[in-house]
Amino acid sequence: MRELLLEIWTSVRRNKLRTFLTGFSVAWGIFMLVILLGSGNGLQNGVLANFNDYATNSIDLYGGRTSVPWMGYEKGRRIRMRNSDLEILEREFPEVEEVSANKWLDGKKATYGHEFTQVWLRGSLPKVQQMEGIKLSAGRYINDADVKNYRKVIVIDEPMRRILFKGADPLGRQIKVGGLVFTVVGVMQGDAQRNSSSCTIPLTTGQLIYSANDPEVNNVILTLRGIDTDEQMEDFEKRLIRRLSAEH
């Protein structure tokens, strides 16, 4: 054993650079492993935190694309969900407790006075607030009267308040989004230091002025009741797909 240790020590002394590089590589590998494990846990916790406030009995529906040709239509046709689908879900499925929807209206330029920022705009129905667990730091969310009367009201987020209003009270102020004037009625909670901003207007208003009154929605949110087993959920999914497929 003594001779073996002496041989190792002699080899180390003769190859100092190689020894250093080997040790550094091992240390760097351990360091990166710790960083990746920490990042992975942080990402997981962040994702879970984002969904903590979502209704636990909710599901999201997206149109997607067709997988096979049908009735003269080619494979890969985009399925465009519409306002009428919400009525079908409410009327024909007793398991559906609440229905809501969003329409993404892409990036727009928002301005107030000499200040401006790029924002992600969406049109939503009032129940989205409860289903997605949206919290407000000021004012209110979109309501039924806004939707019914196509009101030009908007709910902004904290980054928008910071950039456009320098942290001042924005309620009742008018801003331009995509060249059109909206009145601020609420502010959503969130990290004010984020660079990206998002804002919400009534679904009907967005469909009317940005989509030529096209009734398409990008996703439908459902909250369910009376489904307690995997078998019940599977049966509901089959009936849901079969019924909506008949419409599209």
Feature map (PLM): residue ranges:
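Hydrophobic, regular-secondary-structure patches
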Residues: 41-120, 127, 163, 208, ...
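Residue-level recognition of transmembrane alpha-helices
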Residues: 23-25, 38, 179
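Mid-to-C-terminal secondary-structure elements
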Residues: 127-142, 146, 151-248
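Amphipathic alpha-helical segments that mediate coupling or scaffolding at interfaces
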Residues: 8-11, 46, 50, 178, ...
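N-terminal Sec/SRP start-transfer signal
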Residues: 1-31
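Alpha-helical transmembrane segments
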Residues: 29-36, 40, 44
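Short aromatic/hydrophobic contact patches that present stacked aromatics
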Residues: 27, 36, 219-223
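Hydrophobic alpha-helical segments typical of transmembrane helices
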Residues: 4, 8, 22, 46-47, ...
